[in-house]
């Protein structure tokens, strides 16, 4: 059995409790440690971790990052808040009922994207096969990298985690396995600051006693349907023939059969997964006036732009989303001549759609996004017709640099200030 220290990377004796070189208790041991190459890395409570990094007084306090109003939602909760049951996407009023002493912080996407970009760069130093899932998580295929770096994938990931702690100031959790399904599952087993391994020899047995919900993508509706048929654990799926599962559940049944047997043929795809980038907010009170909606739209466009720039993408389509006071959703899409990642262009495009929708109807939610993503090298070419577009683009990129260095509120456009006054 192979074993090493996650702190100094020194090899360790199997069964040892402490590193003989540095004294660390963080030893990792597994029979397949030297051969597994598919990793999933997830930043621990990312937004909250960045806020705690920048404000040491928050270190031991329950921190919630999200909309500051009771009608908002939780973006991220730190692990102290999670002890009280607070979870991402939970309504803020519910989170504060569970954790009334929580410190609520509005998101600072300029800060988060700067950290994400730094981490992404570190990943790419190890392998070009990095598939981002969001700002704070990604798959890595480290096959063949040992010849380049002189370390097995497991040690490369441990070294990466340590480097992120030192240079970015946050912790990450890592899962290592032989396919994406199990690597992601492994990364969730030992949070925070964890490193878990699921080998090929143990995978099917490991899954056997796990609830069906452990299968990524088996949502509440599918779980309820399976439970109605008496299927609550993965082992029950393993015991069924593929043809019986297909007959009962169609293609979903075959998908369940493969994953229950630890089979996942998906490759780590640097261009995969990310299909759109969006941001939305729920208002404290319903808004009907165009001018008020316009100010909120700018703030959301800035957030989408920041995420797009961090991911290295732009979008060919701008999408506006509105939800009425009666919970009816309106979605409008506008196609562009060339993809964009600029907040100004996203805002101007969505504003025209908003102008047509702002007919006196009271809205409780507004969102904007981009889809049909393209690499940032294809985004925002010089506009020979609109002389002002180049100046606006240059101004925006200058503002990005200031915000990344001094924080998201270092430079605020008039539109954003009006948005803050109206909230």
Residue ranges and their predicted role:
Residues 68, 89-92, 188, 266, ...:
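N-proximal short alpha-helices
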Residues 104, 328-333, 377-380:
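Short small-residue beta-strand/loop micro-motif enriched in glycine and branched aliphatics
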């Amino acid at each position: 059995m192979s074993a090493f220290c996650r702190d100094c990377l020194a090899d360790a004796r199997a069964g040892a409790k402490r590193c003989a070189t540095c004294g660390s208790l963080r030893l990792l041991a597994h029979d397949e440690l030297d051969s597994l190459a598919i990793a999933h890395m997830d930043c621990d409570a990312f937004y909250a971790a960045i806020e705690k990094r920048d404000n040491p007084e928050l270190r031991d306090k329950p921190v919630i990052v999200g909309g500051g109003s009771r009608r908002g939602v939780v973006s991220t909760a730190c692990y102290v808040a999670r002890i009280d049951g607070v979870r991402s996407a939970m309504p803020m009023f519910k989170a504060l009922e569970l954790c009334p002493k929580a410190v609520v912080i509005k998101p600072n996407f300029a800060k988060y994207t700067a950290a994400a970009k730094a981490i992404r760069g570190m990943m790419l130093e190890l392998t070009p096969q990095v598939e981002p899932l969001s700002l704070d998580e990604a798959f890595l295929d480290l096959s063949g990298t040992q010849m380049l770096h002189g370390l097995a994938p497991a040690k490369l990931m441990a070294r990466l985690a340590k480097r992120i702690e030192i240079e970015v100031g946050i912790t990450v959790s890592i899962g290592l396995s032989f396919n994406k399904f199990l690597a992601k599952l492994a990364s969730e087993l030992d949070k925070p600051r964890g490193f878990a391994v699921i080998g090929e020899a143990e995978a099917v047995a490991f899954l056997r006693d796990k609830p069906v919900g452990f299968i990524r993508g088996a949502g509440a509706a599918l779980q309820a349907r399976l439970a109605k048929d008496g299927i609550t654990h993965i082992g029950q799926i393993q015991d069924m023939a593929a043809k019986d599962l297909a007959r009962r559940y169609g293609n979903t049944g075959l998908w369940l059969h493969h994953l229950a047997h630890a089979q996942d043929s998906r490759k780590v795809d640097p261009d995969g997964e990310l299909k759109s980038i969006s941001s939305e907010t729920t208002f404290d009170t319903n808004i009907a006036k165009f001018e008020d909606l316009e100010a909120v739209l700018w703030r959301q466009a800035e957030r989408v732009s920041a995420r797009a720039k961090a991911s290295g993408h732009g979008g060919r389509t701008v999408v506006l989303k509105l939800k009425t006071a009666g919970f009816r959703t309106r979605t409008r899409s506008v196609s562009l001549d060339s993809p964009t990642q600029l907040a100004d262009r996203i805002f101007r495009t969505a504003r025209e759609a908003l102008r047509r929708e702002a007919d006196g109807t009271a809205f409780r939610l507004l969102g904007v996004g981009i889809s049909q993503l393209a690499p940032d090298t294809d985004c925002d070419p010089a506009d020979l017709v609109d002389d002002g577009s180049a100046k606006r683009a240059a101004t925006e990129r200058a503002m990005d640099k200031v915000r990344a260095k001094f924080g998201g509120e270092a430079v605020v456009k008039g539109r954003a200030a009006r948005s803050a006054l109206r909230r």
